[in-house]
């Protein structure tokens, strides 16, 4: 963990009084605000969240947002940021791209020192302004366009590139899963035509071209976002051995495919875990059985130090609740979000709360690393702007109605 979060803090040797979750304490048009004010002579440090509460991403954000709120309260309760209180303000774009820049401006005008975002395309839209203003942007998403100038030097992705995940999973399947006495497996790919889908498709096609003895890519489809009944694509891929299908679009495809009586094994990505509840309700465990995905965290049933800490944290702020109660988005985003607060903590330690600015946050960000038992390598450098540097492979199991680990942590295949 970071400076204050390992040792005594990680082992929760601090006083473990049960705390009530700070809910939205101020409501204004298109915005939400919570967190401490500047009590006791402390400097108020404002964190902005540019997101989608009421649009298509709203259900997922409803599960993710509490982890940000809880970490704000945790850092304030434990006074982990010297001489400072953290305040969280949020702007709801409803995933309307016309509101991305006004939302950024709204957060900036109210003093946000850094901005967290969950918006597809949001970073590409606001990063030129963030570069101009010196405000670091921390994104739950990653795509190549985020890392292109202008403004890319102020961008941190608190996840991992889909292209590296895809290549690493294919490499694992070829070495550890497929029986080549059956010949070269037929591979298919299906996704919506988003920046992430384009990146992932390019990575899969590149890997297959470089390794024709490992996979025969027989079909690769990008369809318009929102497609829910991909019957034509399902038929085209009916004879595949493996098919990449992820997130909401993957669930629609998998249901169409299974309902048509086809039998390929599905491959997924860590982001799929954020839609865990949706997959269960859409498909049920019988149709999900065998779905093989990468993960950035240990499954919550494991007695793993990283998983145990999240469960203890949940019990502190939501007594009696389990990770499953809180939702996959909460659990899956915990260490990603924690990284933002550890970077904030280090920046304030370096320059003082009264002197905190975007440059201090950026400087702390590029030096950040996390050494936590039970996790892959986490960290940034001046040139590497994605947080997580490895995955484990898991299989969704109808028998256990959970996820079964198939591998240790695997470094990425470039």
Describe each PLM feature range.
Residues 48-69, 91-98, 120, 190-199, ...:
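Extracytoplasmic "Venus flytrap"
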Residues 257-334, 412:
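Extracellular/periplasmic periplasmic-binding protein-like sensory domains
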Residues 49, 107-120, 138-140, 186-191, ...:
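Periplasmic-binding protein-like
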């Amino acid at each position: 963990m970071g400076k204050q979060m390992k040792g005594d803090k990680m082992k929760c040797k601090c006083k473990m009084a049960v705390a009530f979750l700070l809910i939205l304490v101020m409501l204004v048009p298109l915005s939400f605000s919570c967190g401490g004010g500047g009590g006791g002579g402390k400097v108020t440090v404002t964190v902005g969240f540019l997101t989608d509460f009421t649009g298509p991403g709203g259900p997922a954000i409803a599960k993710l947002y509490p982890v940000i709120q809880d970490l704000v309260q945790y850092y304030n309760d434990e006074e982990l940021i010297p001489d400072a209180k953290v305040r969280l303000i949020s702007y709801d774009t409803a995933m309307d791209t016309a509101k991305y820049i006004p939302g950024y401006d709204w957060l900036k005008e109210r003093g946000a020192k850094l901005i967290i975002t969950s918006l597809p395309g949001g970073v590409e839209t606001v990063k030129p302004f963030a570069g101009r203003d010196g405000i670091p942007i921390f994104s739950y998403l990653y795509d190549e366009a985020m890392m292109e100038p202008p403004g890319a030097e102020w961008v941190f992705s608190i996840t991992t590139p889909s292209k590296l995940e895809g290549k690493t999973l294919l490499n694992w399947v070829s070495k550890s899963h497929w029986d080549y006495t059956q010949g070269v497996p037929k591979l298919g790919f299906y996704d919506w035509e988003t920046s992430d889908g384009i990146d992932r498709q390019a990575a899969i096609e590149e890997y297959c071209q470089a390794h024709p003895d490992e996979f025969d890519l027989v079909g690769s489809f990008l369809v318009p976002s929102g497609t829910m009944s991909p019957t034509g694509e399902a038929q085209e891929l009916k004879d595949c051995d493996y098919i990449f299908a992820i997130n909401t679009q993957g669930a629609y495809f998998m249901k169409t495919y299974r309902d048509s009586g086809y039998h390929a094994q599905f491959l997924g990505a860590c982001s799929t875990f954020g839609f865990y509840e949706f997959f269960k309700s859409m498909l049920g465990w019988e149709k999900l059985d065998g779905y093989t995905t990468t993960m950035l965290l240990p499954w919550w049933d494991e007695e793993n130090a990283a998983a145990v800490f999240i469960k203890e944290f949940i019990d502190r702020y939501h007594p009696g609740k389990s990770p499953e109660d809180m939702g996959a988005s909460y659990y899956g985003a915990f260490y990603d979000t924690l990284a933002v607060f550890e970077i904030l903590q280090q920046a304030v330690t370096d320059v003082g709360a009264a002197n905190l600015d975007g440059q201090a946050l950026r400087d702390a960000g590029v030096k950040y690393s996390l050494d936590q038992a039970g996790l892959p390598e986490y960290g940034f450098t001046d040139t590497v702007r994605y947080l997580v540097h490895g995955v484990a492979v898991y299989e969704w199991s109808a028998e256990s109605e959970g996820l079964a680990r198939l591998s240790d942590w695997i470094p990425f295949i470039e």
